[in-house]
Amino acid sequence: AVAAGKHVFLAKPVAVDVPGCRSVEESGRKATEKQRCFLVDFQTRTDPFYREAVKRAQYGDIGRIVCGEATYFCGPTWGDQAKWLAEKPGDPEMRLKAWGLDRALSGDVITEQNIHALDVAAWVLDAAPLHAVGSGGRKARTAGTCWDHFSVTFTYPQDVLVPFSSTQLGDGWDDICCRMYGTDGTLDSHYFGEVSIRGRLPYRGGKIPGRYQDG
């Protein structure tokens, strides 16, 4: 598409491995050179409350950013895909159809879904993480090959640490959140809830009525 001079709109995951990510990155670079749009769909990036809060944090309203935290807690996902796999276990066509529960095809939950919370941290810091250390596992999920919990600490430039945790374990706490802590305040953002800043220069913020309808 880039070679043909077209605009590109991508949904996540843009890739599931390092070579794929590098290929997409290079395509984005070429699109910019050609003055073509190359956009990855994150609803938060078009949310006016997220945009204003991030802008204020980057302008220094929360002071020097010291650290952050991100979470993605929810129940099991891809229920229909789990049924398909149960009906035809080992069927190659069903594996492709149920890609969201396949680690090799989806990049696992942390790549395919959790990226919504992780992207906010990278957006606020305007940087990619330098390295990450963590683990996870699969103790409740029975369908597919994806894990059901993660715990990872990302290190950003200036030694800014952003610990991240994720679960998909039945009914319970449900929140997609990213908080960034500064010397003068805190940016508090919730994917399906309020976005605000508390501190020396507060921002009341708010939330849009429907994430998928309006995002």
Question: Locations of the language-model features?
Answer:
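Predominantly a Rossmann-like dinucleotide-binding segment in NAD(P)-dependent oxidoreductases
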Residues: 33-39, 44-144, 154, 170-172, ...
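Short hydrophobic-aromatic micro-motifs
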Residues: 162-163, 187-189
